[in-house]
Design a protein with these regions (language model features):
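A compositional/structural signature marking long, glycine- and acidic/polar-rich segments
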Residues: 145-149, 154, 166
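Active-site lumenal/periplasmic loops and adjacent helix-entry segments of GT-C-fold
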Residues: 15, 19, 25-145
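Membrane-interface alpha helices of multi-pass inner-membrane proteins
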Residues: 161-171
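Structural signal for the C-terminal ends of transmembrane alpha-helices
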Residues: 12, 109, 150-159
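Short, motif-level signal for alpha-helix interfacial/capping segments enriched in acidic residues
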Residues: 4, 19-20, 118, 154-158
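N-terminal membrane topogenic signal
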Residues: 1-18
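Compositionally biased, low-complexity segments enriched in small residues
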Residues: 3-6, 112, 162
Length: 171
């Protein structure tokens, strides 16, 4: 498919455009409030990252939300970067990932055209509600992005492999 600017659009370019739009739009408030955290949740996340403890007891593995820390702890411990700076970078990256998920869901599950899916991703990225949720709740943003990428796998539930893959992705 050709765009009005003469660029041929593919799914990989659509994902890249959606990720870039989400990243840039979510990065603006982080840059404006640079040395300070935007949300009070960021202080909570930074505390756990600095403490280095995800689970106080092994049983909290099943009752706590640890997936965000699973991605951020190794980066924080190996690079030694400040936890607030890492969270200021992780927020826009996670929002870009979620915007990509909206595009992928519209393209794969709903069967929309490339232009319509790009519009859905662009519309999601400028909504104030989605921007607000992504600034406060990084764990929810990660979970929503993973859900949007996992839902198109439901179409492949006719095979055992597809069922197992979608259940693993959703759990």
């Amino acid at each position: 498919m050709r765009s009005p600017f003469g660029i041929s659009l593919t799914d990989s370019k659509g994902l890249l455009m959606c990720f870039s739009a989400g990243l840039i739009l979510r990065l603006i408030p982080e840059l404006l409030a640079f040395p300070y955290p935007i949300s009070w949740d960021m202080v909570h996340y930074a505390y756990f990252m600095r403490s280095g403890i995800v689970w106080v007891h092994w049983s909290s593995f099943f009752t706590s939300t640890w997936l965000l820390y699973f991605f951020l702890f190794p980066i924080h411990s190996h690079l030694g970067v400040d936890s607030f700076l890492l969270l200021k970078i992780a927020g826009p990256v996670l929002f870009g990932f979620t915007v990509c998920g909206v595009y992928w869901f519209a393209r794969s599950f709903l069967g929309w055209s490339l232009k319509k899916s790009l519009f859905a991703g662009g519309f999601f990225s400028v909504q104030l509600a989605s921007l607000r949720v992504s600034s406060e709740f990084l764990r929810n943003t990660l979970g929503f992005g993973l859900l949007l990428f996992a839902l198109p796998l439901i179409k492949k539930l006719d095979s055992r492999r597809g069922l197992l893959l979608s259940l693993c992705f959703l759990c």
